[in-house]
């Protein structure tokens, strides 16, 4: 009887070594890719939050300047339901109704918090806590203060520098 050497002709599939190499490659790709993906997501949320902040600041600044230039013509702002509300000129930063009208305007436009997309990007001036990505507007004496908290690249909360508009400089 002759001994016949086994052949690999009819074997189908992968060897254990080949499978282990593929699993190791997938593990390395996941170890590198997942943190990078999370970093990209965090960067995009931070960028969107800062764009919202700048949009709010520019809008309020423009509306106050238009108020002065147009000789007291009331501002027409959008309300939460998409309708129009008017705010008298000159603007009173201490008036919660004025602050609320600005907040409602951005909620009516559908501005969302990038960290919590189900919620508006603005919070109420009643002093409620503001989560990251949330923009608050508050008025004191002759100053509008617009604030925002965001997460930095390390995931730590940071405050966007306050933007202040001194009303006495614009209204006369």
Language model features with spans:
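Short, Lys/Arg-enriched N-terminal segments with co-localized hydrophobic residues
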Residues: 1-8
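Glutamate identity and glutamate-enriched acidic tracts
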Residues: 5, 18, 51-54, 63, ...
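Generic N-terminal initiation segments characterized by hydrophobic and/or small/turn-forming residues
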Residues: 5, 13-17, 26, 56, ...
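N-terminal single-pass transmembrane signal-anchor helix
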Residues: 9-38
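Catalytic cores of transferase enzymes with a strong primary signal for eukaryotic protein kinases
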Residues: 15, 19-24, 56, 68-81
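Membrane-proximal N-terminal amphipathic helix
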Residues: 42-71
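Periplasmic/extracellular, small/polar-rich flexible segments of pilin-like filament-forming proteins
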Residues: 65-172
């Amino acid at each position: 009887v002759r001994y016949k050497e086994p052949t690999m002709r009819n074997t189908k599939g992968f060897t254990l070594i080949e499978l282990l190499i593929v699993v190791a490659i997938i593990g390395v790709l996941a170890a590198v890719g997942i943190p990078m993906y999370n970093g990209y997501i965090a960067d995009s949320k931070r960028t969107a939050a800062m764009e919202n902040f700048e949009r709010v600041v520019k809008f309020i600044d423009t509306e106050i300047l238009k108020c002065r230039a147009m000789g007291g013509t009331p501002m027409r702002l959008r309300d939460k339901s998409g309708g129009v509300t008017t705010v008298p000129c000159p603007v009173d930063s201490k008036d919660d109704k004025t602050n609320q009208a600005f907040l409602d305007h951005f909620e009516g436009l559908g501005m969302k918090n990038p960290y919590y997309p189900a919620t508006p990007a603005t919070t109420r001036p009643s002093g409620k806590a503001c989560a990251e990505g949330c923009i608050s507007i508050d008025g004191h004496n002759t100053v509008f203060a617009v604030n925002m908290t965001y997460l930095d690249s390390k995931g730590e909360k940071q405050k966007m520098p306050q933007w202040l508009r001194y009303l006495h400089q614009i209204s006369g």
